[in-house]
Amino acid sequence: MKHLRKIIYSLLFIAGFASCVTDDIGDCSTAETANAQVMLSLSVPSARLPEATRAIGNDETINSLHLLAFENGTLAEITDITSKYQNASEGKFYVAVKESTGQVGLALVANTDVSALSTGMAKDAALQSLIFTAANLTYMPMYGETQEFDGISRNRTYDVKVNLLRSLAKVEVQYNSTQSKSEFEFLEIEVLNTRAQGYVAGQGIPATSPIVGSIKVPPTVNSSEPNRQEIASAYVAETVNDASNKISVLIRGKYYGAEGYYRLDMIKAEQTDEIDRLTRNYKYVFALQNVNYAGRTRQAALSGEADNQAFNSVVMTLSADESDILDITTDDRFFLGVNSATMQLADNGRICFAKLKILTNNYSEGWKIVDAPAGVTFSPGTTGGKATSDADRKVSSVWIYIDTGVVTSDFDFYVTSGKIRKTITVRLP
């Protein structure tokens, strides 16, 4: 019997030890240091092509990721979870968070030096210590947080989704034209008067952040003649646009060989109001078509009237969900944009398909698809884009299905909105 008791005690000891070494989130010492299990579902902004040609190569890449746990408004934990994310499936992974009976909030910080943080800091002070410098960034700083939990316990499960937001704004000029390069050559843009630094976590604008007078960026050529698309874009820190600090974009180009400058101000509608602030995680797009006159000297462009009206170009503000709208056409008031004006069908046997994304700020009329040949169908339909207000507009996704038994060559159809008629070319596999 005594021998049997020893065996039982040994088995209990082994079982207890095994429960400690196999539980990677628990702690078998005391209840005070026990960890709760939190499942994080991380939503990272999709890559937006073309990538900005200033420093950051891919604005969705996560090179480092840290979890911040706040308890009752105080930073309680800082955990490097980069490897967990990199080994995760579809952005879902477990993290260990200490149990607490207080108010607990979790935050994720991507691609940011967190060495300025220390436990015990107040939340506002901690977040305000996370500052980036916009110049020469390799990876996009991002931030997201959860709702607060009324206590957190290992006796409960937590399935939490965190949306990471980019900490910078993007300014972009799209040149979509049928002009030859000898008629107009797009050389570069200069984004004027933006802040050099910003808060990673959206705490406003650092008071000590200096102004960068000029950021020069050459365009990326996406398509050549006869239908040219060249895009130049730059990531910038959040900046107020007002009389004391006017944000503009200079375009440098050659009109029939003569180099000159054109200035675009942040005019947003009908040549009157201007955007009052560049905001993180938003994209500000100027769409240019044919350039039909010579530019000025740089100083004349800076001191004279803006070229928005002559170019018929106002700035369009796109949210993160809208920023994959890459090909935009404007009239004197509205814009109509698509993800691409050339659709390459995926080979799926007889029925091939492609996905078209459409966005317009003409939400009262919406958009229509017209003049498609027989053998082409659209799902969910050929009309859409209506909303109750500009704030409620959404990107429409339309699947294009082609019966290659009927359609045997490349073809065009059109997307219209108001006075705008946009050609969409579909190429067979």
What are these regions (language model features)?
Residues 264-266, 419-429:
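C-terminal edge beta-strand
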Residues 338-340, 351-395:
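Surface-exposed binding patches on compact interaction domains or structured appendages
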Residues 128-166, 174-176, 271-327, 429:
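Extracellular beta-sheet/turn segments enriched in Thr/Pro/Gly and aliphatic residues
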